[in-house]
């Protein structure tokens, strides 16, 4: 399951225990739409990870706060601490590795 994130729930989401992944995207972003089903598959195959999606048009303040300059961009957190930020996309195998490595 992918949680829709905005300024009301973003901080509590990333502060959750365990690994959380916030994807920054936009409805108009073609690469974001292409990888959406892949992200859903990865989320379903990795139930210990929590996935969330931030629409940069609706929540531009969050994107600015974290320095998101392009989309899709993924921020990976562990227990509320930012581990890494990446805009790497590619095959499902590559994206799974990038998003799930600790």
Task: Map each language-model feature to its residues.
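Thiol-based oxidoreductase modules, predominantly thioredoxin-like and allied folds used
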Residues: 4-5, 24, 36-43, 47-61
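Short acidic active-site motifs
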Residues: 9, 58-62, 94
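Short active-site neighborhood of thiol/selenol oxidoreductases, capturing the structured segment around
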Residues: 15-27
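Short cysteine clusters
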Residues: 29-32
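Structural micro-motif
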Residues: 60, 66-75
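Non-catalytic, surface beta->alpha helical segment in thiol-disulfide oxidoreductase systems
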Residues: 76-102
């Amino acid at each position: 399951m992918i949680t829709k994130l905005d300024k009301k729930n973003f901080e509590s989401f990333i502060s959750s225990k365990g690994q959380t992944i916030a994807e920054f995207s936009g409805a108009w972003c073609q690469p974001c739409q292409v990888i959406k089903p892949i992200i859903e598959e990865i989320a379903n195959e990795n139930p210990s990870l929590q996935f969330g999606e931030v629409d940069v048009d609706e929540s531009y303040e969050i994107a600015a706060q974290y320095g998101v300059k392009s989309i899709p961009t993924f921020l990976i957190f562990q227990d509320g601490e930012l581990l890494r930020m990446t805009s790497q996309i590619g095959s499902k195998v590559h994206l799974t590795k990038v998003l799930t490595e600790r």
